Amino acid sequence: MNQPMALTTRRSVIAAAGVAILASASPTIAGKNRSDHMLETLKAIITGWHNHDVEAVLAHVTDDIVWRNTSGYRPAVKGKAAMRAVLETMAPVIETSAWRMFDAVETQDRIFVEGVDEFWTKSGRHIVIPYAGVFVFRGKLVSEWREYFDGRISSEMKDGAPITDELKEMISRPSI
């Protein structure tokens, strides 16, 4: 399979997965009657990260968390100690974080979100990475965290590429 077809196929699979999750959510869960504990937990994680507080992030994950934060090009981070090590490596590089969510839908034990990981590095780079994510809960804690994003955009932004008009449009929506 040639590269453009592989990329198109991968994006189609990710989009189909998102549609399947949205379609499977009952009106009670996806609508106004749902419990917001999962969304509130994610907002607390985001607030912790905005404050460069690794322990505040980790307070909302299980000890055996599985964190797939590279869209599959690196192995999953497994366990709270390993996640702490990764976050402690990332935190000193980031000057300011504007990570946010635009849309979310819940099922019984998971929440599917669309958002943007936007941040400014201490070296002055402005990075914008649109993403979709799935967070699986065990009780009130996240036990699995999967992120899906275009690694090409991530690499180009980290190498200094400017924010495109398309990215500006994608991230200009109000956050939840």
Where are these regions (language model features)?
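N-terminal secretory signal peptides
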Residues: 1-8, 16-23
